[in-house]
Amino acid sequence: MAKNLNTVSFTVLLLVLLMASTGILETEAACFKFLGECGAVPFPGTNADCTSCCVGNFGSAVCAGRVEVEGGVKHCHCYGTS
């Protein structure tokens, strides 16, 4: 039993190291930094309109623009990597 557990643990460790070294684990998690708001409040457009507004204001650092409701009012929130 212990030998099987050691083999499984070693295999899992190798898989995690392989995934980390090849960048497989990289996701859009880097896209969680709030850059600011964009456009009018309440924001009248869609997520695509929001992303366009964000790119216009914040440049290439933007990886997502989302219309989110705060207190019943729609806002355009910009998220990026820097």
Swiss-Prot record:
- Where does the UniProt annotation place the signal sequence? 1-29
Give the record's GO biological process terms: defense response to fungus; killing of cells of another organism
Q: Per the record, GO CC terms?
A: extracellular region
UniProt-annotated location(s): Secreted
Name of protein: Defensin-like protein 208
Entry keywords, A to Z:
Antimicrobial, Disulfide bond, Fungicide, Plant defense, Secreted, Signal
Give the domain of life: Eukaryota
Q: Which cysteines are joined by disulfide bonds?
A: 38-63, 50-76, 54-78
State where it is primarily located.
secreted
Write out the similarity annotation.
Belongs to the DEFL family.
